[in-house]
Amino acid sequence: MAVRGANTLTSFSIQAILNKKEERGGLAAPEGRPAPGGTAASVAAAPAVCCWRLFGERDAGALGGAEDSLLASPAGTRTAAGRTAESPEGWDSDSALSEENESRRRCADARGASGAGLAGGSLSLGQPVCELAASKDLEEEAAGRSDSEMSASVSGDRSPRTEDDGVGPRGAHVSALCSGAGGGGGSGPAGVAEEEEEPAAPKPRKKRSRAAFSHAQVFELERRFNHQRYLSGPERADLAASLKLTETQVKIWFQNRRYKTKRRQMAADLLASAPAAKKVAVKVLVRDDQRQYLPGEVLRPPSLLPLQPSYYYPYYCLPGWALSTCAAAAGTQ
C-alpha cells in the first residue's frame, strides 16, 4: 500500500510494522508482500499481488511474473542482492525498522498526503480498488496488534484527513463557532443597549444648603407677603433683583411662607371647633386669709386617755363591736 505524492510514491509505514512483526515471529514473508526495504518501484507492482491475496484470482504464473518484474527493475536488482524470498534473515534490516527511518517515512507520508489533498482533494478519492481491498485486509489483521503498533498505524492516516476538516463534523463545528462568533458580534450593540437600559444605582443626593437671609431681606419679604400672597414671574424677578436674591430663592421662600400660614390657620380652626371644658363648682375649704387651727389647739398636749377604736381604725374598717360602741356613745351624747 502506498501514498501517492506530488511526483513519487512513498511506501506506507504499516507495511514496515507488519514485516517487523513477522520477522520477530520467525515467519517467512508472504509471497504477495514486499520485504522490508522495498522501494517505490517494488510498491508500484504491489497492487496485483495484494489483489491476488484478497480475491485469490491470480495464479502462480502471474505471481511469478510479478516477481520477475520486481527483480528486473533497477531498484529490485539493488535490493535483491542481500535477501531471498524464503529467508527473513537475508532482508535488509536498516530499511524501515529503526525509529529514525520510521519518522522520516511518516514525514514523507504527510508531505505526500498534503500534496495529494491540494491537487485532487482527499486521498481516498484517488486510491485504486486493489489498494482499498488491501486496506480492508490490513484492518482485519489489526485486531491482534498491540497499542504501540495501532498508534503507529493511525499516525500515518492523520495527515490526509486534516484537509477535509472543513467538510466533516469537526468542520461543521468550526463553522458553527464562526457563525456564533459572527452572531455575537452582530448582537454586540444590542447587548450594549440592554446594559445601558439597566437602571444605574441611585447616587446619594447632595444635601442642599439653606439660604441665610438677612434681617432686611426677611423684613421686605414679609411685608410683600402680607400685601400679596402670590407673585407673577415679572414681579418675582423685580423683587429678587431688589433684594439681590435669585428668583428660585424668592419662589421657595413664598412657598414655605404660604405653607406655614396654612398650618397656623388649621391649628386655630381646630382649637375653635373643640368643645369647651365642663365647669364644676367646687366648695373652697381652705382660704388663704383664714387659719385652720387656733393657737391654743396646736400647742395642746395629747390626751392620756386610751384611744377609742374610732381613732386608730378607719370608719369603713371598724369591727362590729367597735361600731356598736360608737353608736352607743353617740346615743348618750
UniProtKB/Swiss-Prot annotation:
UniProt keywords, alphabetically: DNA-binding, Dwarfism, Homeobox, Nucleus, Repressor, Transcription, Transcription regulation
Region ranges (Disordered): 65-113, 138-212
Biased composition regions of type Basic and acidic residues, renumbered to the chain: 138-148
Feature: compositional bias, Low complexity: 75-85
UniProt GO cellular component terms: chromatin; nucleus
Keyword Transcription in record: yes
Signal peptide: none
CDD domains: homeodomain (cd00086)
Pfam family, one: Homeodomain
DNA-binding region in chain numbering: 206-265
Feature: compositional bias, Acidic residues: 89-100
Gene Ontology biological process terms in this record: animal organ formation; cell differentiation; determination of left/right symmetry; embryonic skeletal system development; intestinal epithelial cell development; middle ear morphogenesis; negative regulation of apoptotic process; negative regulation of chondrocyte differentiation
GO molecular function: DNA-binding transcription factor activity, RNA polymerase II-specific; DNA-binding transcription repressor activity, RNA polymerase II-specific; RNA polymerase II cis-regulatory region sequence-specific DNA binding; sequence-specific double-stranded DNA binding
Keyword tRNA processing listed: no
Subcellular location field: Nucleus
Bilayer-spanning residue ranges: none
Free-text function comment from the UniProt entry: Transcriptional repressor that acts as a negative regulator of chondrocyte maturation. PLays a role in distal stomach development; required for proper antral-pyloric morphogenesis and development of antral-type epithelium. In concert with GSC, defines the structural components of the middle ear; required for tympanic ring and gonium development and in the regulation of the width of the malleus.
Clinical note on disease: Spondylo-megaepiphyseal-metaphyseal dysplasia: A skeletal dysplasia characterized by disproportionate short stature with a short and stiff neck and trunk, relatively long limbs that may show flexion contractures of the distal joints, delayed and impaired ossification of the vertebral bodies, the presence of large epiphyseal ossification centers and wide growth plates in the long tubular bones, and numerous pseudoepiphyses of the short tubular bones in hands and feet.
Entry's family note: Belongs to the NK-3 homeobox family.
Protein name: Homeobox protein Nkx-3.2
Source species: Homo sapiens
